[in-house]
Curated annotation (Swiss-Prot):
Lineage, broadest ranks: Bacteria, Pseudomonadati, Pseudomonadota, Gammaproteobacteria, Enterobacterales
Signal sequence interval, chain numbering: none
Gene Ontology MF, one: transmembrane transporter activity
Function according to Swiss-Prot or TrEMBL: One of the determinants for resistance to ethidium bromide and quaternary ammonium compounds.
Subcellular location: Cell membrane
TM stretches of this protein: 4-21, 30-47, 58-79, 85-104
Protein name, entry field: Putative ethidium bromide resistance protein
Organism: Escherichia coli
Amino acid sequence: MKGWLFLVIAIVGEVIATSALKSSEGFTKLAPSAVVIIGYGIAFYFLSLVLKSIPVGVAYAVWSGLGVVIITAIAWLLHGQKLDAWGFVGMGLIIAAFLLARSPSWKSLRRPTPW
């Protein structure tokens, strides 16, 4: 459970850092540039802790997928980025993949055969 909490912290750090990239104007503005560096530092530190308890494939898929969805939603809501129906479908598929990655495998749900 702690791994999933650390994954949320890593995602939040990555989203904050990526959102600040635009404001940093190519690292020419000090405050947003500091937010980018600190945010990515937090993101990768907590991602490294996540990998102690969650398989790397699952952790990276969730981290990158949810990061893309959240950053796209922020850009759409706050910066007026255009998002058509296919964009919403794509984000829905990413969320579905997250839910599938988090679910137990079908093999673990099967009952052992008696013979």
